[in-house]
Every structure is written in structure tokens, then in C-alpha cells.
């Protein structure tokens, strides 16, 4: 059980928002969404791709109870457990103000596969993993609800380069959860992941497609050659730099040709901007380094 700083109805509604499931999946878990009915109603299903003991598995969950804003439940149809039943309970906290007095309780009943031996040997490991997962979920839920309450605005259309990366994928989930439209953009067809190319609104180096950016409110530019992709040879460092400097210039020049330009362009790089600072604690107000 965890306290939540909102009304019970808002706490329940959070779980119905698009992208909530992906947002609540811990980054250390090997779980990805294959398909979803985008609903908590009885009979709706979610299909996840996961691994058990290194073996790829599909986890199919079906919603079995739906009583807004108090309760919903799901059960495993097939997957890594012998059985799994998950109940989500939303209540007012005794003595708390209604606008900040909700609580969320997750009740999980499960059985491990392959009988008593696995139950005996693996139950404590499974219990710790489940407790860690729900500690993460509860913290993210509380933080997101505070964020939603703080930034209530009309939905915006975001175009994001590098949307399949660590930062881009998490930003996309968060923006979707907040009610915005977050769509990948690519430099050119065939130069990014297949997932990005399948749903990208435009390739910014293609003059015939740049007009598609006219309907975008915000462009977030995160694309760049990975700094962890190999040894930092002189050639590799030049590629890392060019992927940020040259490609960013190309994107800006392409956007500048539009009659109706995006209102905002955000270009972000990662911790490399600060250079080698040893054990110094760094944040957005820290000065940049002077090395590569």
C-alpha cells in the first residue's frame, strides 16, 4: 500500500492513461509491450514479451474485474507463472484531505511454475523481485501524479529524434502519459531502428517530407551516435561529434525553411558535456567541460 497525493478518481484514471503500463515497468526487467487493447475493462488483454531463465516468453494478461474508481483486476492467461492474479484497490486515506488522500494497494496472488521444488527454492527470490517491482511502480505513480497536477496544459504534438534510445523512449512514454502526442522523427529512411521508421512522421533530411513538421508544436532532438558503441578512436570521436553538430545543424536548417515552424526546439546531449570531473556532483547548472 502506498499513499498518493490526489483524489481517488485521479489515481484510478492514471492507470487508464495510454502508456501507463510501459511507464510502470521497471527498467531492469526484461519486459516489453507486444500488444494491448488500451483498456482496463473486463475482457481486455495485454500481451508482453519477457524472459524466464533466459527463455523468451509471451505473457498474456486479461482484465477480469473493473469497478471505477475503486478497483480493477487482471489474471495471467499464459506466461511465466503457474498462476498470477493481481488486484488494484483505490481508497481514501483515513484523516487525509480528499484532494490528497488516496491510497493504492496492490494485492498479488501467484504460484511459481514446476511445482514444489521451484516454490521452495525460488519463492524468496521471486518475492524480492516482486517487492522491488511494486516499490518502483508506487514511487513512479506518486511522482507522475504530482507532475500531472503541476503541468496541466492542452495536448501538444511532439516530434522526437532518437526516440528509441534510453532518454527518448522514456520521454516518449512520459509525454504520452501526460496526454500529448509523441511521434518519432528520423534523419532518413533506413538510418534508424525499424520501429522508428515504421511510425516516423518524417525524415528531416528529405526535402519532400519537411512540410510534415508544420503541424508539430515541439521538436526534441536527441539523436546521435552512441558514445558506448566502441573504442574512441580518432575516427570514432569524429563520428560522435559530427552526429551531434552536423546533423543538428541540418535539422535546424530544414526547420528554418518552414512557413509555420515548431514553437520550440529542444536539443539535449547527455553527461558528456561536463567532461571528466571525477566525483563532483553535477546538475543542469554545472559548467561544461573543455575536453572531448
List the model feature ranges, each with a label.
Residues 1-41:
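Hydrophobic ligand-binding cavity/cleft-lining segments
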Residues 22, 32-80, 95-103:
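Glycine-rich portal/gate segments that line the openings of hydrophobic small-molecule binding cavities
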Residues 73-131:
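Beta-strand/loop substructures that line and gate deep hydrophobic ligand-binding cavities in soluble
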Residues 158-178:
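N-terminal Rossmann NAD(P)H-binding glycine-rich loop of SDR-like oxidoreductase domains
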Residues 161, 216-222, 266-268:
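Rossmann-fold scaffold of SDR-type NAD(P)-dependent oxidoreductases
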Residues 185-190:
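N-terminal Rossmann-fold cofactor-binding loop
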Residues 200-250:
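NAD(P)H-binding glycine-rich loop region in Rossmannoid oxidoreductase-like domains
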Residues 249-291:
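Conserved Rossmann-fold NAD(P)-dependent oxidoreductase catalytic core, especially the SDR/UDP-sugar
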Amino acid at each position: 500500500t502506498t499513499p498518493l497525493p490526489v483524489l481517488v478518481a485521479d489515481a484510478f484514471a492514471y492507470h487508464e492513461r495510454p502508456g501507463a503500463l510501459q511507464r510502470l515497468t521497471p527498467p531492469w526487467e526484461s519486459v516489453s509491450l507486444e500488444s494491448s487493447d488500451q483498456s482496463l475493462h473486463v475482457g481486455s488483454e495485454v500481451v508482453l514479451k519477457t524472459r524466464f531463465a533466459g527463455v523468451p516468453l509471451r505473457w498474456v494478461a486479461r482484465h477480469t474485474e473493473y469497478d471505477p474508481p475503486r478497483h480493477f483486476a487482471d489474471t495471467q492467461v499464459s506466461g511465466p507463472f503457474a498462476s498470477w492474479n493481481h488486484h488494484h484497490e483505490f481508497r481514501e486515506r483515513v484523516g487525509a484531505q480528499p484532494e490528497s488522500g488516496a491510497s493504492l494497494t496492490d494485492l498479488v496472488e501467484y504460484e511459481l511454475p514446476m511445482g514444489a521444488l521451484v516454490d521452495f527454492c525460488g519463492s524468496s527470490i521471486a518475492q524480492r523481485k516482486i517487492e522491488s517491482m511494486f516499490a518502483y511502480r508506487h514511487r513512479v505513480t506518486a511522482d507522475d501524479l504530482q507532475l500531472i497536477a503541476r503541468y496541466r496544459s492542452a495536448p501538444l504534438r511532439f516530434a522526437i529524434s532518437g526516440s528509441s534510445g534510453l532518454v527518448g523512449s522514456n520521454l516518449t512514454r512520459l509525454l504520452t502519459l501526460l496526454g500529448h502526442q509523441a511521434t518519432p522523427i528520423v534523419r532518413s529512411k533506413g538510418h534508424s531502428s525499424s520501429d522508428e521508421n515504421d511510425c516516423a512522421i518524417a525524415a528531416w533530411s528529405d526535402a519532400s517530407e519537411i512540410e510534415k513538421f508544420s503541424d508539430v508544436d515541439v521538436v526534441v532532438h536527441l539523436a546521435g551516435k552512441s558514445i558506448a558503441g566502441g573504442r574512441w578512436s580518432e575516427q570514432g570521436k569524429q563520428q560522435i561529434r559530427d552526429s551531434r553538430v552536423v546533423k543538428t545543424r541540418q535539422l535546424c536548417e530544414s526547420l528554418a525553411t518552414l512557413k509555420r515552424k515548431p514553437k520550440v526546439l529542444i536539443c539535449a546531449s547527455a553527461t558528456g558535456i561536463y567532461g571528466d570531473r571525477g566525483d563532483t556532483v553535477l546538475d543542469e547548472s554545472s559548467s561544461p567541460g573543455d575536453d572531448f
